Every structure is written in structure tokens, then in C-alpha cells.
């Protein structure tokens, strides 16, 4: 599964029918970030219940600024992560051999571009600058710089998409901001499809890889997990619960394609 030149096709032949079905769903469930999200709404950084717990210490204005900074830090990482996903999908599109896989990745490129758009708009509404987490930056560059197709596609479709699904599900359940929930609901619909595509494609492709190849990819994903664990030091809520749930989910997805995630 080494990196290769693009594969050209003389006929439209489908090797993985489940991917063709997924591509049909992808075409059906496209959405427009400009018309399907009401961006005129203000951001709500905290709930009344949350403020009740801190009102003896903070004014509403001060607490709003604190929560806006926290949220800006989180969404800065997400904005960067979606740009990385966009770049990774473009790399993978050039390397994958099957035409139906190219179709799915082409659709995912459009999805990732839309996610960059909505997270960028949300950051503009927060109007707070935040730094990029160095461990997350290293993780992304580790993926982008890999010259091994198996590392890159497992890292993208199983690891990053697994993290995204878990994180966005948490936001859906806990965010006090209706604008954020609407935005994340649409993004999550895409990310769930991406994660499903990864399992469908890789369970088909990994049936014939060697033990050494499996070990190499497992080592790579384990390194990604360690970097992510280091990066997730604070901005994602109850960190230990989130990390455990995310680890379990990624480990499950890897198991479906015959790989193991080691803590």
C-alpha cells in the first residue's frame, strides 16, 4: 500500500458497491452553509444555569468574555483541523486506485471545504484570536507528510473522522448556543458519512495486507493518539470522559478493519 501515481480508468467499473451507494447519499444530502444556517443570530456563550454557578465571582460581561476565549480556542483548532482534512482528502484522491473511492473523496473534499467555511464564519462572530495547539499542529503535519498511503488513509478516515464525530456529538448535547448546534448538526451529518466510508473502504482493502504492514499502520495511529491525547489538555469539556469515549470509538472502528489501537 505504498504511495502511487494516479490510476486511470478506461471504463466506469465499480469494485466496492457499498461505496457507490454512499456516493449516492452524498449527492442527496449536500447542504448550503449560506442559506441553511441563520448567521444573523448572536453567539450564546453560556447558559443561564452555568452563569448561576459563577455569578458571585463574575459579571455577565466578564463571564461572556471568558467563555468566548475558551470557545475561540476550541474553534481555532477545529478550523485548522478542517483545513487539514481538506488537504488530506486532496492527497488521497490522487493516490486511491478505485474510481468509486475517488467519487467519495471528491464529495468529501466539498464537505471539508464547507466545514472550513462554517467554522471560519463562527470564529468571525466570536471575534477573538486564539493560538494553535502545537501538539495538534504536529499531529496534522505527521499525517500530511506521511508518504505511506495506508498510514494516511487510516489516519484520515478512521482516526481524524472518529475524533470529529465524537467531538461534534458532545457539542450537540452540551452547547448552549442554538447557532452552534445548528451548524454542528449539519457538519456531523457529513462527518458520520465520512467515518462510515472509511470503515467500508478499509475493511475491503485491508483483507490482504501483510502483518508488517498492519503493524506499521497500528504504530502510526498509536502515535497520532498520543499526540491527540497531549493536545486535548483542556478545551473539549470533561477531558477524561471525552478521551475514553473517543479512544473506545476509534479502537472499535480500527477493529472493524482488522487493526488495533494501543494506549
Task: Please provide the spans of the model-predicted regions.
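Short, charged, amphipathic alpha-helical segments
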Residues: 103-107, 182-185, 215
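Well-ordered alpha-helical scaffold segments within catalytic/enzyme domains
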Residues: 90-95, 168-172
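Alpha-helix capping/termination and helix-coil
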Residues: 172-175, 188-195, 199-213, 228
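Alpha-helical transition-metal enzyme core signature, strongest for iron centers
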Residues: 78-86, 108-123, 154-168, 187-198, ...
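Helical catalytic core of nucleic-acid polymerases
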Residues: 142-144
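Terminal targeting/low-complexity segments that flank the catalytic cores of oxidoreductases
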Residues: 1-88, 94-102, 125-132, 147, ...
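All-alpha helical catalytic cores of prenyl diphosphate-utilizing isoprenoid enzymes
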Residues: 125-136, 140, 150-170
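Acidic interhelical loop/turn segments
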Residues: 169-181
Amino acid at each position: 500500500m505504498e504511495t502511487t501515481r494516479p490510476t486511470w480508468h478506461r471504463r466506469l467499473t465499480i469494485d466496492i458497491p457499498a461505496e457507490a451507494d454512499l456516493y449516492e447519499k452524498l449527492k442527496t444530502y449536500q447542504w448550503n452553509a449560506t442559506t441553511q444556517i441563520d448567521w444573523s443570530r448572536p453567539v450564546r456563550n453560556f447558559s443561564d444555569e452555568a452563569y448561576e454557578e459563577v455569578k458571585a465571582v463574575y459579571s455577565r460581561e466578564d463571564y461572556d468574555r471568558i467563555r468566548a476565549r475558551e470557545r475561540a480556542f476550541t474553534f481555532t483548532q477545529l478550523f485548522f483541523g478542517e483545513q487539514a482534512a481538506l488537504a488530506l482528502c486532496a492527497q488521497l484522491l490522487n493516490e486511491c486506485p478505485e474510481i468509486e473511492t475517488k467519487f467519495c473523496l471528491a464529495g468529501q473534499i466539498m464537505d471539508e471545504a464547507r466545514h472550513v467555511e462554517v467554522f471560519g464564519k463562527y470564529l468571525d462572530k466570536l471575534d477573538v484570536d486564539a493560538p494553535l495547539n502545537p501538539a495538534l499542529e504536529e499531529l496534522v503535519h505527521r499525517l500530511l507528510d506521511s508518504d505511506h498511503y495506508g498510514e494516511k488513509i487510516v489516519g484520515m478516515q478512521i482516526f481524524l473522522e472518529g475524533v470529529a464525530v465524537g467531538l461534534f456529538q458532545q457539542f450537540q448535547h452540551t452547547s448552549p448556543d442554538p447557532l452552534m448546534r445548528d451548524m454542528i448538526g449539519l457538519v456531523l451529518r457529513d462527518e458520520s458519512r465520512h467515518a462510515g466510508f472509511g470503515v467500508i473502504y478499509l475493511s475491503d482493502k485491508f483483507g490482504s495486507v501483510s502483518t508488517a504492514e498492519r503493524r506499521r499502520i497500528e504504530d502510526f495511529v498509536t502515535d497520532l493518539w498520543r499526540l491527540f491525547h497531549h493536545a486535548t489538555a483542556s478545551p473539549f469539556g470533561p477531558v477524561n470522559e471525552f478521551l475514553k469515549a473517543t479512544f473506545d470509538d476509534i479502537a472499535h472502528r480500527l477493529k472493524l478493519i482488522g487493526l488495533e489501537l494501543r494506549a
